[in-house]
Amino acid sequence: MPLTESAWNESVGWFSSDHKYSTSSNKMRGEEASGTVLHRLIQEQLRYGNPTDAHTLLAIQQQALRRGGGAASSSQSSSESLSQDEPHSPQLSTRQEPQGQEHQVDYQHSENYTTYPHHQEELPTYEQAKAHSQYLASQWCLPHRVCSLQDSVAIQKPCEEQDSWDMKQGHVRSISDRLLHFSMESGKMPCSASYPQINGYHANQHLQYNQQGLEYNKLAPYTEYPFSVEYENGYKAPPPFHSQHNRLPTPEVCHRLSTSPPAGREVNACSRSQLEMLMNENKRLRQELEGQTEKALKIQKLEQEIQRISEAYDTLMKGCAKREALEQALRNKLMAEIKRLQHSSVQAAKQAEAADQNQHAIEKLHLQNEEQKLRCACLEQEVQHLRNEAEKHQRRSEALESTLRSTQTRSQQLWTELQRKRAYVEKVERLQGALTQLQATCEKREGLEMRLRTRLEQELRSLRNQQRQPQPVGGTSHVSVYTLQENLREKEERILSLEADKIRWEQKYLEEKTMREFAMDAAATAAAQRDTTIINHSPCHSFIEELPSTEYRNQEVENRIRSLYAQILEKDTVISILKQKLQHEQKGQLGALQPATADSSIISSHSTPAHTAQGKERSHFNDQAAGTLHSSHAPVEALAHTTDQTPHTEAKPKNIQKAPSAVDLFKGVDDVSAEAVEIFI
């Protein structure tokens, strides 16, 4: 918004009034500061100075207040406050920073106090004391030149440094010198007894100055001496502080003290009238000295206050210049801000007009935006719902997959267990069939043994009957007996050789059987390990996929069984042919053995132990055949081996004539082999 002219005038008037108020306040503060300087200096001196100078400082302040005139009100208030606060000022007032005047005031008042005599005597004026001191110096220099030269040789350098100061400060020693030499000029009249005391007092004060000068030289700066005041040109600075205090008595003073007349003569020579005159003059000089000291202090304070006021004025002018520059900068900044606000107000008005025109379109867009937001919210809800459904389906599919994997593993385990159980069942069935066949063969063997036993018993009875009957004696019988014995011996040898061959072939058969069993067991274990590794490394595929391979294996096994069955049939035909040949040979031999009935009894007696041995061997062979049936892997090979061995064992007796016991033995072997073949089929 643009500012009006009245507002601008008010702001300018406020700045000008503020500036006037600040300048007036700064002036008042400068006056108050100038009025309080004297009070602060006297307060510092009273607090940290010599306690014996307090009364002197109060007297100086009161005289300055009475003679000041211009600054009567401020100094009076400061003196009243000082007199009121004097007893407890060290406890209540705070320590102010030194202004460079503490040591100066302390030294001035200590000098005033030491130069003032403590009795009510009037001092001569400054001009009289100065002229009289010069006159005395000229009178005393001639008679005491020798002493002064000797003393000045020892302390020449301190005297040269203090000549100018002794001339300016001659009134310090003018009191005692004037009294002494005035008494000498007036005819050596006796003086009062107080002057030696005054002289001694000044000598003691001079020694005290020498002792105090060492401490002031270390602690206080060089100050100005207020007694050498020139009213036209101000006052001159004294020499350095160490030259004022750290000096020895001059040769003139030493000689003056040593050559002064006795105290009794001075008292007798001075008259009472001269004493009163000197006392009055001393009092008047003291008063003048106090007045001049007060004036010098006042002038010094005024100069300091003027300098302080000038410094304050300079700082005030600098502050005013800074304030004016700041006001100008603020004014420029305010004008620039006003212009900017005017320009922005114009632009805002234009924008408001354009906004009014576009308000309807903006409202329509807001409505469309709200509709789109609602649609987006609905779509987001649908998307979130679909995501939840997808997550549910995914979790469900994962659960189904996990269950499928678990069922697959379980089905695989069940399938393996089923295969194992099937194999076990088949093995049990085979064993049961073999057991039944073995039972049948055992029954058949028992039947054969019973028939053989009955036949042998019949033969034995027939032989016993023949032995009981009388036999004819003749050459034919002797020849027949001899021939029968030879035939019997040959048959026995043949039987023994056949038994040895049988035993050898049985051992060979057992060895080959055990070797084949070991080989088949190793192959079976390797196949089982291979199957287990395949099953473990492929847990994901189904068992239904393995069915073709199992069917193929079953088909291979069936084909192998068929081939083995064909081989067995061939062996059966060979066995049947050999049996027929053996039967034809046995029939031819039976016709030759029928006439020898007596020899048959001997043969039967020899054949019975052989038959029993053969029965034992047959039973052992049957047990071995039953053991081969228990091995589930190679029953056919063992049977083929036995069938291969049987022709070899049966081929040898072709060219040999056999006894009936040997025929029965081979019949038993043939029956056992036929029964074993039937069992395996």
Curated annotation (Swiss-Prot):
InterPro entries noted in UniProt: Angiomotin (IPR009114), Angiomotin-like (IPR051747), Angiomotin_C (IPR024646)
Alphabetical GO biological process terms: actin cytoskeleton organization; angiogenesis; dorsal aorta development; dorsal aorta morphogenesis; endothelial cell morphogenesis; establishment of cell polarity involved in ameboidal cell migration; hippo signaling; regulation of cell migration
Main location: other
Phosphotyrosine modification, residue list: 126
Keyword Transport tagged: no
Compositional bias ranges of the Polar residues kind: 90-102, 597-611
Self-association and partners: Interacts with SRC.
Family affiliation: Belongs to the angiomotin family.
Name this polypeptide is given: Angiomotin-like 2b
Gene: amotl2b
